[in-house]
Amino acid sequence: MDIILGVVMFTLIVLALVLVILFAKSKLVPTGDITISVNGDADKAIVTQPGGKLLSALAGAGVFVSSACGGGGSCGQCRVKVKSGGGDILPTELDHITKGEAREGERLACQVAVKTDMDIELPEEIFGVKKWECTVISNDNKATFIKELKLQIPDGESVPFRAGGYIQIEAPAHHVKYADYDIPQEYREDWEKFNLFRYESKVNEETIRAYSMANYPEEHGIIMLNVRIATPPPNNPDVPPGIMSSYIWSLKEGDKCTISGPFGEFFAKDTDAEMVFIGGGAGMAPMRSHIFDQLKRLHSKRKMSFWYGARSKREMFYVEDFDGLAAENDNFVWHCALSDPLPEDNWDGYTGFIHNVLYENYLRDHEAPEDCEYYMCGPPMMNAAVIGMLKDLGVEDENILLDDFGG
């Protein structure tokens, strides 16, 4: 009898707790439709369900806000202005938003919970962002650790981007084995030397990342990316390899791939100032886009030079393209510096790190380096070294433009 009574009492207690939880949920968790007012325009208002994040609610309504980290709160790109209904700003947002900006309503859409009706402001250009399912045209090695992914836009569609812009690419859940990569023989030596074929990328959820475009606006119907494989650092080989780069490197001709865009802020200024482009690694992409756009589409007569850093000749690419541009345009020159040339390279060009080469062979004797515009994209250490050198020369922040893909 005592056992039965104990079971009954336990059951009643559990039921009571469930009722308390359900009651609390009904009071604390909103139900019904939530209306998100956008730019005070009734036609742009979004009706959604509570419980998710603002970034997802916007995407569900076909409004794609840039988020290079896929909504993790680390890139700080998904900035919107929340005029009401967003709650208090979170500590994760304050890494990217100043207190002054927060007072103005600046928030990260990926961190704002949708709980009540909201009133937000978005830049008008966001409404031009679209999503496309593209087809892989080619995916070829251009260097040991860099591939050129070329995508075909669906027939009748176009991506109205500006040179220096970027798209976001989606990777589904996947299991990629590096052993399945088709690495050309000329690059296999380093892959085997560093035992890279042992790695695998196992991902159970969709991932979104941003990549700058290497093509320029008049290369119609395609999107071209330079993608560096993100392998674990040598001193910490147990770190998982890069999710998105592993996926992109697995793509083959004919595969489907979803992108959204265009996005961007790394655009050329409309001035007559001299342009100095500095790149390294996969930072080649926006450099190619900008330089081709200036010379082939705009037929610019601005003085410009391109300084690219690589380890060896094996890591140089688009050489014929830039040689051709230099031959066709008297106002353009380009130089490559190798930091670790191989004996078989028979290299007689510049050697060393690109920031030193640029300074010693050009800017040191330039009559007014502070008047030039500097456009750069490369590994974080390169960016920091170049910026430090430019600061020492008296170049103001407004003339230093950075596509900080690795920051």
Swiss-Prot record:
Superkingdom per UniProt: Bacteria
Q: Indicate the transmembrane segments per the record.
A: 3-23
Cofactor comment in the record? Binds 1 [2Fe-2S] cluster.
Gene Ontology CC? plasma membrane
Q: Which Pfam families match?
A: FAD_binding_6, Fer2, NAD_binding_1
Q: Where is this region: Catalytic?
A: 272-389
Note whether Nuclease occurs among the keywords: no
**Catalysed reaction, written as an equation:** a ubiquinone + n Na(+)(in) + NADH + H(+) = a ubiquinol + n Na(+)(out) + NAD(+)
Q: In which residues is [2Fe-2S] cluster bound? A: 69, 75, 78, 110
Q: Where is the 2Fe-2S ferredoxin-type domain?
A: 32-126
Has UniProt tagged this entry with the keyword Coiled coil?
Answer: no
Its localization reads: Cell inner membrane
Q: Classify the protein's membrane topology as the record does.
A: Single-pass membrane protein
Q: Which stretches are annotated as coiled coil?
A: none
By its UniProt entry, which CDD domains does this protein fall under?
fer2 (cd00207), NADH_quinone_reductase (cd06188)
Q: Which GO terms describe its biological process?
A: sodium ion transport
Q: Which UniProt keywords apply?
A: 2Fe-2S, Cell inner membrane, Cell membrane, FAD, Flavoprotein, Ion transport, Iron, Iron-sulfur, Membrane, Metal-binding, NAD, Sodium, Sodium transport, Translocase, Transmembrane, Transmembrane helix, Transport, Ubiquinone
- Using the UniProt record, give the first listed, main subcellular location: membrane
Q: Which cofactor does it need?
A: [2Fe-2S] cluster; FAD
Q: Which InterPro entries match?
A: 2Fe-2S_ferredoxin-like_sf, 2Fe-2S_ferredoxin-type, Beta-grasp_dom_sf, Cbr1-like_FAD-bd_dom, FAD-bd_FR_type, Flavoprot_Pyr_Nucl_cyt_Rdtase, FNR_nucleotide-bd, NqrF
Per UniProt, residues of the FAD-binding FR-type domain are: 129-269
E.C. code: 7.2.1.1
Record note on quaternary structure = Composed of six subunits; NqrA, NqrB, NqrC, NqrD, NqrE and NqrF.
- Role played: NQR complex catalyzes the reduction of ubiquinone-1 to ubiquinol by two successive reactions, coupled with the transport of Na(+) ions from the cytoplasm to the periplasm. The first step is catalyzed by NqrF, which accepts electrons from NADH and reduces ubiquinone-1 to ubisemiquinone by a one-electron transfer pathway.
Q: Which family does it belong to?
A: Belongs to the NqrF family.
The protein depicted here goes by the name Na(+)-translocating NADH-quinone reductase subunit F
